[in-house]
Amino acid sequence: MNELRIVFMGSPEFALTPLKMLLAEGYAICGVYTQPDRPAGRGRELCPPPVKALALERGLAVYQPQSLKKPEEQAVLSGLKPDVIVVAAYGLILPQAVLDIPAYGVLNIHPSLLPRYRGATPVAATLLGGDEWAGVSLMKLEAGLDTGPVYSRAAIPVRPEDTTPLLADKLAFIGGCLLLELLSRIPSLPQPELQDNAKATYFGMVTKDMGQVNWQTPAAEIERRVRAFFPWPGVFTSYNQKTLKILEARPQKLGLGLQPSQVRVYEGDRIMVGSASGELEIIRLQLEGKAACSAADFLRGQRHFDGVNLGV
């Protein structure tokens, strides 16, 4: 058992991997902070964050404050006597009083190559930007939004099949590796590198309306949205006054001469849609009220799909 006392703060799936890696290395997790349970699903039943479920399974103490700005909540955290706090997609702002608690500071695993893509959804931003490389930064958290100095970074190529969950899983593991390497150097931590604020970019929260297709944009951009916004909010258009979700797509350059939003049934079982540049081939899709299916299966039930305009 490593004697270093760690408080872990994280909420979604992304945070599971570094927490598991800390536990596997025998670190003493003296407390796990995660977001409060939220209503989810059609029944709106309270659902715990993924990190809470893992923490309880491992017998760890779980804390779910609505905010860490209250002195009484800060006193509880201080009472855990953490040497270091590790943050991975926690979702709450940490005031300066919290940042000052651990002797070795607050370490944050941020899934982008900082200062690029500061903000809440850097993985989606990486895919939307069409970047060739994705990455993760291990930084010292400070009061600004992802502005703290960086201890280490690692980059990986973005694959054509990467979606936000797939890419996030890979970055979570790499971030965990960076974290373990840095923790092994305590108490002799290296000097972190200041970020170049002049090169900083930001990307905020993803909202549902971002999933609405604008057929006046290039097919390559729409396809990136399909991968970036999977599984939520998804990418969608309309057909026959029903929502049509695009689950998987591929940009093409076939020179079919289609107008933006115009459908062409190609080679009998493929769906091409015109855009501002090139065609978007829809590979998997889901019509409102129906199950998700391949383009070929969809066309078997929609014999008049050729030539229609989507989103009108």
Curated annotation (Swiss-Prot):
Instruction: Give the enzyme class.
Output: transferase
Q: Which reaction does it catalyse?
A: L-methionyl-tRNA(fMet) + (6R)-10-formyltetrahydrofolate = N-formyl-L-methionyl-tRNA(fMet) + (6S)-5,6,7,8-tetrahydrofolate + H(+)
- On whether Transferase is a keyword of this UniProt record, the answer is yes
What's the EC number here? Answer: 2.1.2.9
Single GO molecular function: methionyl-tRNA formyltransferase activity
Q: What does this protein do?
A: Attaches a formyl group to the free amino group of methionyl-tRNA(fMet). The formyl group appears to play a dual role in the initiator identity of N-formylmethionyl-tRNA by promoting its recognition by IF2 and preventing the misappropriation of this tRNA by the elongation apparatus.
> Protein name, please?
Methionyl-tRNA formyltransferase
